[in-house]
Amino acid sequence: MLYFIFCQNLSSSSSMSNSILFLSLFLFLPFVVDSLYFNFTSFRQGDPGDIFYHGDATPDEDGTVNFNNAEQTSQVGWITYSKKVPIWSHKTGKASDFSTSFSFKIDARNLSADGHGICFFLAPMGAQLPAYSVGGFLNLFTRKNNYSSSFPLVHVEFDTFNNPGWDPNDVGSHVGINNNSLVSSNYTSWNASSHSQDICHAKISYDSVTKNLSVTWAYELTATSDPKESSSLSYIIDLAKVLPSDVMFGFIAAAGTNTEEHRLLSWELSSSLDSDKADSRIGLVIGISASGFVFLTFMVITTVVVWSRKQRKKKERDIENMISINKDLEREAGPRKFSYKDLVSATNRFSSHRKLGEGGFGAVYEGNLKEINTMVAVKKLSGDSRQGKNEFLNEVKIISKLRHRNLVQLIGWCNEKNEFLLIYELVPNGSLNSHLFGKRPNLLSWDIRYKIGLGLASALLYLHEEWDQCVLHRDIKASNIMLDSEFNVKLGDFGLARLMNHELGSHTTGLAGTFGYMAPEYVMKGSASKESDIYSFGIVLLEIVTGRKSLERTQEDNSDTESDDEKSLVEKVWELYGKQELITSCVDDKLGEDFDKKEAECLLVLGLWCAHPDKNSRPSIKQGIQVMNFESPLPDLPLKRPVAMYYISTTTSSSSPSVNSNGVSVTFSGIEYGR
């Protein structure tokens, strides 16, 4: 839950590394200063006392800090980090660089008259805030001090209410940077009401060289559509002249006569003081003895020699790995090995005119393999691809064993010159994504759409239930669903797929997939299951019927109120389900009246059932097929979309967070194999 780091980790895997590190520490020890890092991903009762809660602020059951009760007025709450944070050095007089990232949410319940907002502040350690100076004073100021603080103070405010006495008169709600005053030193317009209840991710950074204090922010769902509204702000200020060397960091939020709820979801901070580099090194050179210089030279030469040997061994291992991969693949039945030369010829040297699409893993090209007289799609993985050697080998091993009419057929592979290529059958009608959201002239008729839904369900039934092992696809989305000449489904891209025994419930894999299609429990815990694949299947069904993307971050009509386009597709469809407006408001407008209402209702309700926030409430793929064939009735879903709660278990670490080989792998777009 909390990561807290001081620069004291001096361990190494070899004696030589230890020697070099010890020498470096010896040389630069006089100039080492405090360095601090922490990361709160949630806030809970009973946590170590690293956060102090004041006023009405309390840690809530959902892991957030609730600064005030939304049902009461004139409340103020604040939190502070319990330890002092050094922001400039008494020895050098120089300020530190620091960066803090946090996420928060404001529920502006009274859109016509908001509360007063939330702010991040820096103040002297132990400074006593005025007792309950609520409302626009944010518990930081009092009227008797002429809108100034009784102690040095710098704060960044997300102000939801315009106070005529001190707030700018040319904008309403705003983001401001304030220097010891309620009057913002610099500010920019910010429409608080249009972002109500959306999660905001903000970052505040200070550059000690340029003296620039900058703020950036972005929202998860609602985009900034007002041209007068910015998403960044900066102000030049020398913190070493304004604040003491040690300060406390914190957040404060207030509501006046209007109710407004403020929540802090996460908080991360890193701070380090720079050394006095130029003068230090001059003194250092003078102070080093001749023997120390010789020793350092020897260590550098030795390090270069060892590094060269390691590079040579790495190259030898790469060659051995390539040979090993080839042997593994050659043992697999079905797909055959092609030479790189043949693929270069088939794709006209991977000509841009042959390119069918490009994604995070690389590019896909149309090719003509004269050797087998077949048109193919050649998937060429890029050198810095997220889909590296392991995923390449994984995709070949899994898909080479699968045989089903609704799966893309893998014809062959190539692993030469450190290049990884997969050769698939060319699917002439491209991806479902290109038909629903692209610029193809021909509209998908309703019969074809329903056929696509059944075909995808058939492919998923084979993967989950009918093959020897359960195959978790983990990346079911419209751009991975190919359509042949008769618009039969061909599910492809098995680079993220995983095998597991049928009796197992889930498989912890690390996060991978595409936002908008990933189940909430999978995003939160990284645990893939049949149910997480079913969730993705449900999203695709909703896209098929509505002709809308799973996530659309646009806003219509420039209105101050939240529009439908600011919601995810699941939220919108479920809301219309509750209003009993599925058929009248959800079906793709391009279809007009040319669709089967019973089938449309079937796919929409089934899509919501599959995309239920609670994984235990989703159907199996067998149940889904029975519903699509009208062998089972439609489920009776809640009129309002349920909210599932997930507890994230975190541990304390003594080093900076890192991502291992099973880390995050997410994409925002796919590729289409075909035209």
Swiss-Prot record:
Which keywords does this Swiss-Prot/TrEMBL entry list?
ATP-binding, Cell membrane, Glycoprotein, Kinase, Lectin, Membrane, Nucleotide-binding, Plant defense, Receptor, Serine/threonine-protein kinase, Signal, Transferase, Transmembrane, Transmembrane helix
Might you give the EC number(s) for this enzyme? 2.7.11.1
SMART domains of this UniProt entry?
S_TKc
* Protein residues bound to ATP: L356, G357, E358, G359, G360, F361, G362, A363, V364, K379
Q: Which GO terms describe its cellular component?
A: plasma membrane
Q: Which reaction does it catalyse?
A: L-seryl-[protein] + ATP = O-phospho-L-seryl-[protein] + ADP + H(+); L-threonyl-[protein] + ATP = O-phospho-L-threonyl-[protein] + ADP + H(+)
- How is the protein disposed in the membrane? Single-pass type I membrane protein
Q: Which residues form the Protein kinase domain?
A: 350-631
Catalytic residues (positions): D475
One of the entry's Gene Ontology molecular-function terms is:
ATP binding
Give compartment(s): Cell membrane
Spell out how it gets used. Answer: Confers enhanced resistance to late blight mediated by the pathogenic oomycetes Phytophthora infestans and Phytophthora capsici when transfected into Nicotiana benthamiana. This resistance is associated with a high induction of protease inhibitor genes.
Extracellular side residue ranges read 36-281
Inactivation phenotype? Increased susceptibility to the oomycetes Phytophthora brassicae and Phytophthora capsici associated with reduced expression of some defense genes (e.g. PR1, PDF1.2, CYP71B15 and CYP81F2). However, normal defense responses to the fungal pathogen Alternaria brassicicola and to the bacterial pathogen Pseudomonas syringae. Susceptibility to P.brassicae and P.capsici is enhanced in plants impaired in LECRK91 and LECRK92.
Signal sequence segment: 1-35
Give the UniProt family note: In the C-terminal section; belongs to the protein kinase superfamily. Ser/Thr protein kinase family. In the N-terminal section; belongs to the leguminous lectin family.
General remark: Both lectin domain and kinase activity are required for resistance to oomycetes, but only the lectin domain is required to trigger cell death.
Q: What is this protein called?
A: L-type lectin-domain containing receptor kinase IX.2
